[in-house]
Amino acid sequence: MKKIILNLVTAIILAGCSSNPETLKATNDSFQKSETSIPHFSPLATGGVQLPKADDSYSLPNIEVKKGEDIDIRPPLIPLAIIQNSITKFDGERSLIVYPKQQAKLYNLQQVERLLKEEGISSTTDGSILTTDWAKTERIGDKSIEIKYQIEQVMTADVSALTVSILHMRRDGIIFTPNVSDKQYYTSERLNRIVLTLTTAYNKQLRDLSSTLIQ
């Protein structure tokens, strides 16, 4: 009897381990059913940040801007009162320096002509007016600019004056009319250079003479 029961149990166990496709399919179906029970979540829809619409009231108009003339940002020059007790001025056309008449023995057209010759600038004198040949500028940024200067000496009973004005101005060989800013700069630069060079040379002569006397 026990043997019969044991055989029956063995048969049931073997039946559970059967490789029958139908049996396996039933097992797989039960697994799929358990998988469908897993919940699925959809993305959370949020309203986000609502930005205000752009207001065109202060928008810049979309227009084509034409380039204007180049602006000269270099600092201007003025005539300097290098001579003792002198007065300087730019009158819109000329730079001038007025000084005591006794100083005219140093600051005069003859000295100016000699100085220009040393710089390689030729000139002609007609009475109290000296006219230079074309002279290149030494201003940084200038391109092929040349100037003809007119230098005049004016004398009264008490004072003497030197004035510098622009007679002609050209760039790359083409003559053009300088504006007031150019006139002020270039006439002041030329007058200051003349007076400073003559003053420096005169002071050097005095120092050399003083050294000779001491020895």
Swiss-Prot record:
Any Pfam family matching the protein: Lipoprotein_18
Primary subcellular site in the record, as a coarse category: membrane
Residues lipid-modified (S-diacylglycerol cysteine): C17
UniProt entry keywords in alphabetical sequence: Cell outer membrane, Lipoprotein, Membrane, Palmitate, Signal
Disulfide bonds: none
First and last residue of the signal peptide: 1-16
GO cellular component, one term: cell outer membrane
Compartment(s) where it occurs, according to its Swiss-Prot or TrEMBL record: Cell outer membrane
InterPro entries: NlpB/DapX
Membrane topology designation: Lipid-anchor
Protein's UniProt keywords contain Chaperone: no
Entry annotated with the keyword ATP-binding: no
Residues carrying lipid (N-palmitoyl cysteine): C17
Annotated family: Belongs to the BamC family.
Protein name: Outer membrane protein assembly factor BamC homolog
